[in-house]
């Protein structure tokens, strides 16, 4: 979904599925395009919008808000696969936005590849959760999240963290082993899991099982980006988690009473 200064655009189509681009009369040369990725169609709509603004307005200042960056998981060269993030970022760079705002990218490769890129600070979302909930420990579900968030997040003085370690089959992507590292006594304690992305939720289900085995009480999850595919996985049905906090960067199905929109 794309909006220009909060005005939806490209959301209607002709019978053959070509987009209809209804425009409004803008009395400004300052624009914020909000890009919420749902399908690759949104990329073509984005291109049309930026080309239009550049064509009609004299040197417009156009800021792109792209909380979730498509293809950010494909952030390296892997034999037999296209380095798709690289080419997507090249496409965005070619559009020459004044600024590109992103949220909690999968790795720093994304922010390195994007020109004039600034990151939205997730500290505000974590602080909001601590204001609402009684949290005893923070848990990072893997080494990557531990290394990343332990550097950039400021936790309350009385809160410490521990983390998980997972081993995947690189061919199938399936997690074949999961363990808790440096786990304190969490009997009857409330745990907040923090990570960037949830697809089917397999990692968080494994983490929830391990935390419950150690006696954890409430388990909450914060992810910056949550895909609708969470409903196709076992995480919600498992009832291991008590609440899931996420932004509106991807998710459009808020039907589960476990999922809460944060930062809205």
What do these predicted ranges mean?
Residues 1-264:
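PRPP-associated nucleotide enzymes
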């Amino acid at each position: 979904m794309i909006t220009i200064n909060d005005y939806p655009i490209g959301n209607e189509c002709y019978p053959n599925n070509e987009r209809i681009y209804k425009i409004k009369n803008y009395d400004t040369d300052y624009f914020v395009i909000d890009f919420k990725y749902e399908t690759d169609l949104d990329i073509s709509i984005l291109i049309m919008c930026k080309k239009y603004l550049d064509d009609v307005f004299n040197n417009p200042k156009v800021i792109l808000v792209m909380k979730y960056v498509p293809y950010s998981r494909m952030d390296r060269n892997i034999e037999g696969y296209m380095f798709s993030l690289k080419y997507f970022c090249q496409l965005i760079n070619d559009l020459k936005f004044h600024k590109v705002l992103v949220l909690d990218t999968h790795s720093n490769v994304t922010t390195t590849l994007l020109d004039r890129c600034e990151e939205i600070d997730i500290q505000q979302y974590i602080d909001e959760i601590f204001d609402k909930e009684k949290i005893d420990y923070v848990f990072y579900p893997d080494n990557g999240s531990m290394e990343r968030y332990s550097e950039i997040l400021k936790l309350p003085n009385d809160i410490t963290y521990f983390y998980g370690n997972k081993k995947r089959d690189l061919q199938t992507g399936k997690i074949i082993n999961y363990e808790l590292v440096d786990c304190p006594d969490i009997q009857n304690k409330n745990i907040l899991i923090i990570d960037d992305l949830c697809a089917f939720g397999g990692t968080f289900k494994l983490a929830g099982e391990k935390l419950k085995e150690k006696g954890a009480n409430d388990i909450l999850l914060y992810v910056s980006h949550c895909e609708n595919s969470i409903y196709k996985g076992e995480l919600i049905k498992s009832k291991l988690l008590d609440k899931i906090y996420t932004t509106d960067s991807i998710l459009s199905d808020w039907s589960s009473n476990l999922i809460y929109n944060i930062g809205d």
